[in-house]
Amino acid sequence: MTFCYPCRAFALLTRGFTSFMSGWPRIYYKLLNLPLSILVKSKSIPADPAPELGLDTSRPIMYVLPYNSKADLLTLRAQCLAHDLPDPLEPLEIDGTLLPRYVFIHGGPRVFTYYTPKEESIKLFHDYLDLHRSNPNLDVQMVPVSVMFGRAPGREKGEVNPPLRMLNGVQKFFAVLWLGRDSFVRFSPSVSLRRMADEHGTDKTIAQKLARVARMHFARQRLAAVGPRLPARQDLFNKLLASRAIAKAVEDEARSKKISHEKAQQNAIVLMEEIAANFSYEMIRLTDRILGFTWNRLYQGINVHNAERVRQLAHDGHELVYVPCHRSHMDYLLLSYVLYHQGLVPPHIAAGINLNFWPAGPIFRRLGAFFIRRTFKGNKLYSTVFREYLGELFSRGYSVEYFVEGGRSRTGRLLDPKTGTLSMTIQAMLRGGTRPITLIPIYIGYEHVMEVGTYAKELRGATKEKESLPQMLRGLSKLRNLGQGYVNFGEPMPLMTYLNQHVPDWRESIDPIEAVRPAWLTPTVNNIAADLMVRINNAGAANAMNLCCTALLASRQRSLTREQLTEQLNCYLDLMRNVPYSTDSTVPSASASELIDHALQMNKFEVEKDTIGDIIILPREQAVLMTYYRNNIAHMLVLPSLMAAIVTQHRHISRDVLMEHVNVLYPMLKAELFLRWDRDELPDVIDALANEMQRQGLITLQDDELHINPAHSRTLQLLAAGARETLQRYAITFWLLSANPSINRGTLEKESRTVAQRLSVLHGINAPEFFDKAVFSSLVLTLRDEGYISDSGDAEPAETMKVYQLLAELITSDVRLTIESATQGEG
């Protein structure tokens, strides 16, 4: 056999060249990865993709990216390796076939536009689907991934495209150079190719459809991340001035004040300048850097729950309205920071006009704040301009945030909602907008609120200090260890769905020009507001501080041994874990001992050591302040506390009688604390709590009766103390009603507060909300709604006395005597 040496040499050369070429991409990626590792610091969304998205790493995973970018691919690779996900550069071997683990949907633009490589995504999709046809056990998880460098939405005039368009190589280089530290990798829920193959087949048309759906997915995801383009401020004002509603309000202003039309129009422009935000992406980026640095030093962690449901709504095109509870001025910054890091657009925020002082006002305005006055009364032009501005935000697709409580809670409990802005939100729907508006209730919790000392002073009568630069600097100078922060997203409320269910003919009120107030608007808004408050509380977060404060404040001397405190925290934790307040509420996974150690680091408690062990003390000067944190989770424990109080008082009681007692008091508790259960749900909840209390050994169940267990009576008494002050307040009001059935509501509220203040002094009650005007006002309204007070103002003596007698059994005899003697003394 003859051998051709030139042929052999050619074969060796070809093999070497092929080997070199096959290794070249690896060398190329290594070289490219060197500058990227320095320039790019990306963030994964969600923070831990595999468990949060339910990815099964034991099954094949492939990644789908929107367009061909090696920088994006290597950024994705870094995040995959950091989270123990398969390396996208490693091919996927299936039944002896090697396939790339990543797919680019679009080839992407090039510097030289005439050169466009052949798009291979459809072929790859078809190859993957075809493997599923031949292998019935195969199930590849297709994970869409977006890699974004920067998130500036751009302006309506100026830039032709926002910076997140598909970039060619040169553009991508500068994007990485300038925005590498402001990048994120967004993992989406996986799509099962097995399900696709089984339900839709495996031919090429399905592959084409899959690629088309993926393109739509990425387009929506980009819009959810960057938001719509921003208008030039003057163009926005011109559009508002041209609206019929503002034009009419300007005419009315000129006529009523006897000024020229130009002067009235100038007044409207001044109001727009006062109200409107001046959103700046560069300010968002700068503030994000500052806050990231600050949070890492002040907070030990920011815990975010249920953000995926919000990302999905944004992806589906919903107009998002964030409705958080209001604990602190920190809420504005914290929520925007969290949303930004969840891959969502920071919202336009309705901020109180009191924050519009230099330099905070201009900064907040560039971060998306628009300012709202405390009242609209007597200024029709202002109310019209504000309503039209809010409607314009909705029509343009911007997310919005406002605090439905109207102001910061001074007690740690939710305030009764203020419905003005919510009403305007529904009026915006009645203008005939096409995008669905969805309200997102949000629970914000802290282990330290910097204003809590000021709140206590204000509740005791001090004048509220006006916000200013010196006050802000004093507050910032006091910031130390703030512990943990909590942002829990509650159950969304799609307004269209709500109106369809409760006001079926609401579309008949749509008017694209004029703001309308149909007869159903006010009661519907009130119901929505109340529902929102319930949903906010449903997303409550228990933490080390509020649990320890609850236990120590339940003790008469505000002190417990470490063993007693541990036992009490275990009681709370087991109740919350085994009978959850709601599916949206969160409970620490740490042990009671670990929570105590963490709380002690906050320097709110004192520890006395002796030969027996540690005694943990809540100092008297701190007790008033710590009620704030206890009140954050009062709603989560009030029902088991009430049950414990009833069982403790009676020593043994049948389930039916217990249910009767709870049923009498529950409407007041529900209204005050925005509890989630309806009356018909109570029997099941009480049964579940009773079974859990039996499991803990707090009570025994004998012949359908609940008996106190003497061995754990202290734990049961401390649990019961959580309802103690609430029951005392109810006793005050019901005694006053019984003693004077014809008392008017205003006098009833005033006298209730007077007796409560007296009780607070004589019996050392440290809770400022004990005699809070708003609490008694809400209670009296509930009594009217429940029929204890008639429309004419008179009470029903027999019913009120019956309830008072029930309450009198649940409070101590000395407190009862103080209540009764106080009213007798006044008489």
Curated annotation (Swiss-Prot):
Disulfide bonds: none annotated. Its EC number is 2.3.1.15. A motif (HXXXXD motif) lies at residues 325-330. GO terms for biological process: CDP-diacylglycerol biosynthetic process; fatty acid metabolic process. Its main location: membrane. GO terms for molecular function: glycerol-3-phosphate O-acyltransferase activity. The keyword Heme does not apply. It catalyses: sn-glycerol 3-phosphate + an acyl-CoA = a 1-acyl-sn-glycero-3-phosphate + CoA. Keywords: Acyltransferase, Cell inner membrane, Cell membrane, Lipid biosynthesis, Lipid metabolism, Membrane, Phospholipid biosynthesis, Phospholipid metabolism, Transferase. It is found in: Cell inner membrane. InterPro entries: GPAT/DHAPAT, GPAT/DHAPAT_C, GPAT/DHAPAT_LPLAT, GPAT_PlsB, Plipid/glycerol_acylTrfase. Pathway: Phospholipid metabolism; CDP-diacylglycerol biosynthesis; CDP-diacylglycerol from sn-glycerol 3-phosphate: step 1/3. It is a peripheral membrane protein. GO terms for cellular component: plasma membrane. SUPFAM superfamilies: Glycerol-3-phosphate (1)-acyltransferase. Coiled coil: none annotated. The keyword Cell cycle does not apply. Belongs to the GPAT/DAPAT family. The HXXXXD motif is essential for acyltransferase activity and may constitute the binding site for the phosphate moiety of the glycerol-3-phosphate. PANTHER family: DIHYDROXYACETONE PHOSPHATE ACYLTRANSFERASE, GLYCEROL-3-PHOSPHATE ACYLTRANSFERASE. This is Glycerol-3-phosphate acyltransferase. It comes from Escherichia coli (strain SMS-3-5 / SECEC).
